[in-house]
Every structure is written in structure tokens, then in C-alpha cells.
């Protein structure tokens, strides 16, 4: 990379797994990148539901869930890192006395792009989203308040410095700017194909040797 070139920044983009990516955690996955910098990348898989519903999750943390529209929504497997920890991707709620959410390994969910939020531990993401790790967002949802659209995961996906760039060079992923309708309005089983459609592609067109970064 020339010295005066800006580093790649795929924050608020989708990573779409290529057929040659056989890692069980990421095969046919769509990852929403919450942060990408020279230090690494952090994202959430948005199309791999677990067997746990949001109502089941709220029961586990001793909260009721009054939002009937959310009760049967699945909790997603966001990635192989910290799989017992919850992450809530949601529409931005505006400033309050927020703090920064921290991840571990690879990119940290803190620093650049993290601003004050309505919740105690939140990362602000360009594109109108936030990612919250503190229980207060669940408490808000339990009362019928909180963000209107949410996606909840257990675990997240993380890449160390230069790791994602190497995987892109190996044609493990396609990349495209994120579309919120894929995250919040598209049935889970259609999200992979809908993300591909943003590039004008269909899954039958892909081969392990082709990629686009």
C-alpha cells in the first residue's frame, strides 16, 4: 500500500462468506462489521440463529419481555468469541451518559467511532446503528421502551491486525456496504442471498476462486 493511501475501512459493511470458507462458524455467513481499523475488525454474524429466542434470553436474565413483536425473534450466534456474552445491535438512540463497549482480542469495541449513547456500554457505528453490551438496553426493552429494531447475539467475530485483509486477499469474503433492511426486515433464511443481491450476484454464480474486496 502506498504510504499516502488511506487504510481500508469496512465499518458498516457486510462480509459475505465465499463457498471456499469452510470454517463452521462462518460458512455461508453474513457478518455486519461494527468496527474496522488498522488494529483489526469486530463484527456480528446476522444470519445464524441459535435455538434460544429473545423471550428465552430474557427469562434467563430474570426480565419480562413486553414487546410481543420481539418475543419469538431468535438470538443469533454472533461469532466464536465470548459466546456467553450478549451483544445488541440496534438503531441509534441518541446521546446520554454512555460509555464505550469493550471487546477482547483483535479489534476493540471502543475508541474511534464510540460516542455517548443512551446506554452504559455502547459503541456508535457510522450508518445509524449502535452495538450495546450492557444490560440496561434489555431492561429498556423489557418495559416496552428501548430501540424499535434490534438484533441480539451471543458472541462476536473478531480479526486481529491485518487478519481480515489477509482473508480478503485469499478470496474468503465478498464485501458490500450494509443495508439495514437485510439486518432487520429480511427473513433469516434469505439474508445471505439478499446480501449477495446487493452486489448483483446470486449464490450459483460463486466459486471458491472468485472474490471481491
UniProtKB/Swiss-Prot annotation:
One of its GO terms (cellular component) is cytosol. Residues 93-120 are annotated as: Disordered. It comes from the Bacteria. Belongs to the UPF0301 (AlgH) family. This is UPF0301 protein Aave_0907.
Amino acid at each position: 500500500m502506498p504510504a499516502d493511501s488511506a487504510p481500508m475501512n469496512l465499518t458498516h459493511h457486510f462480509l459475505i462468506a465465499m463457498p471456499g470458507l469452510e470454517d463452521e462458524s462462518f460458512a455461508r455467513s453474513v457478518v455486519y462489521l461494527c468496527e474496522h481499523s488498522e488494529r483489526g475488525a469486530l463484527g456480528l454474524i446476522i444470519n445464524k440463529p441459535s435455538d434460544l429466542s429473545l423471550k428465552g434470553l430474557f427469562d434467563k436474565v430474570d426480565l419480562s419481555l413486553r414487546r410481543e413483536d420481539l418475543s419469538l425473534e431468535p438470538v443469533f450466534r454472533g461469532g466464536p468469541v465470548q459466546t456467553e456474552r450478549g451483544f445488541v445491535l440496534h438503531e441509534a438512540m441518541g446521546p446520554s451518559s454512555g460509555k464505550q463497549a469493550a471487546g477482547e482480542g483483535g479489534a476493540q469495541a471502543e475508541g474511534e467511532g464510540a460516542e455517548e449513547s443512551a446506554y452504559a456500554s455502547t459503541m456508535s457505528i457510522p450508518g445509524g446503528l449502535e452495538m450495546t453490551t450492557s444490560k440496561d438496553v434489555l431492561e429498556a426493552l423489557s418495559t416496552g421502551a428501548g430501540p424499535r429494531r434490534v438484533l441480539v447475539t451471543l458472541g462476536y467475530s473478531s480479526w486481529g491486525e491485518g487478519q481480515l485483509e489477509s482473508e480478503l486477499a485469499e478470496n474468503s469474503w465478498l464485501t458490500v456496504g450494509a443495508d439495514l433492511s437485510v439486518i432487520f426486515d429480511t427473513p433469516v433464511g434469505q439474508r445471505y442471498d439478499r446480501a449477495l443481491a446487493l452486489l448483483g450476484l446470486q449464490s450459483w454464480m460463486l466459486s471458491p476462486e472468485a472474490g471481491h474486496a
